[in-house]
Amino acid sequence: MATVSTSPLVFSVIIGVYDDWIPLDRCVRSLTQQTNAPSFEVIVVDDGSGDVAPEYIRNWTGVYQLTLIRQSHAGISAARNRGIQASRGLVLVFVDADCKFHPDCLATLAATINKSPQHNSFQLHLVGDCSGIVGRAEELRLVTLQNHLLQPDGCIRYLNTAGFAIRRARVDIEKGLFDPVAVRAEDTLLLASLIQGGELPLFVSKAIVQHAIPLSLLECFRKDFRVAQLDARTYDIIAARGVRFRVSQQQRLRMLLSMWKTAGQDSIGRLAWFVLAARQAPRLIVLFLRKVTP
């Protein structure tokens, strides 16, 4: 298996975007602040946004290797697959447009990949932006999931493409990595495929990506109700494959109690627990109804 080095091109950072130009600007700016990073390119796939990439995005092409691709609206899975086809790096790194890399993220990820030739996929450490209630609730969610789904061998039963990497050799470049059928929860469907293949991502705890949700609390609630059915359809696909990935009711209770304890920290606060519980409700209700309805 190839070892990551500083030559040739190491990382292809692939970002799908749909009208999220301002958050994307912060994301690509964070890549200019990387310290001791190996060589990388950035591929931004515009999934049919209402407006083409603004000038302040196009200007980044003069700072590092940035490729802008525009396609008709086909969904995030198709956008990422298009980015894969255009990529040249030994490792593909996926990140959401509303995320920011910590300064040593790529250097840490490269070092971990070099030391882990037995692993093909890597889950980066995701954190929230605790400057507002939406971000504190997201931090609480991420802390809980990453703590409870971490395995004794350092792998994690969790995959979130807000910060995920995979070796190029593991990917069918022409076919792509993501199933376009999954309009939502495409990363969970990918996790199911990895589990079927006997693999889990290695958790890279020191390669940190901040997920800075740009929506207001009301906008988040509206989105949660809107996408709950889409998430459930992907979970149906996973269930049809016979892959069990969801936690048991007992595990869910332990996670709720753990969240309550974590919410006692001053940096998060109890209100974040209630916000998170409310945001999870639409998805859980839809899943329950699909289970009990003939």
Protein language model features and the residues they cover:
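Short, flexible, basic/aromatic active-site loop/helix in glycosyltransferases
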Residues: L124-H125, E138-R157
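Short aromatic/hydrophobic "clamp" motif used to bind/position activated sugar donors
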Residues: L92
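Glycine-rich, basic loop-to-helix element that forms the pyrophosphate-binding segment
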Residues: Q71-S87
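Conserved donor NDP-sugar-binding/catalytic core segment of glycosyltransferases
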Residues: D104-G135
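Acidic donor-binding loop at a coil-to-helix junction in glycosyltransferase catalytic cores
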Residues: V183-A192
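Non-catalytic, C-terminal membrane-associated alpha-helical segments of glycosyltransferases
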Residues: K223-L230, R241-P294
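Short, well-formed alpha-helical segments that are part of the catalytic scaffolds
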Residues: D20-Q33
